């Protein structure tokens, strides 16, 4: 459910988008906002949500779909290692591939429960992830991905808000 904090943040982001000319800068603002406001900040404190040598951090970014190449390219990311800027993922890889194929949102509150989960982040395996497809004029153009290392960071209510941010 959208709370007043999220509504105010969306208002600010939309106002910012109307004044900024660089699309990637606008999308980076969305990535940063989602990392700051979505997810359970106490998830990392629950026993079992972090494994040995893991620490809580989050990432977000947009994978823009390139249908001619059957892949998606990472842009406007927050928290990803610098060497993964413009990372390209084939359409058939992991859960981003599932979203590309089905064009539906996907929530993995605990990635350990999915034996087919593929590690995309070069530096760590994430424990909780949200994927929201993006459309323009009814056409699939990519997806917004947000992930955290602690399992159970993201719940249904976070994913619903994530989808609202994505549709802006």
Label each residue range with its predicted role.
Residues 65-119:
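Regulatory sensory and allosteric helical modules in signal-transduction proteins
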Residues 25, 32-66, 72:
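Short, hydrophobic-rich beta-strand element in sensory/regulatory alpha-beta domains
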Residues 1, 37, 101-107, 137, ...:
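Signal-transmission/dimerization alpha-helices at domain junctions
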Residues 1-29, 36:
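Signal-transmission linkers at sensory-effector interfaces
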Residues 68-69, 135-140, 149, 160:
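Flexible loop/coil segments at beta-strand boundaries within sensory signal-transduction domains
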Residues 127-135:
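A short, aliphatic-rich beta-strand micro-motif
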Residues 1, 85, 115-118, 147-164:
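Regulatory loop-to-helix N-cap segments in sensory/regulatory domains
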Residues 79-80, 127, 143-153:
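Short beta-strand-to-loop transition segments that serve as allosteric relay/switch motifs
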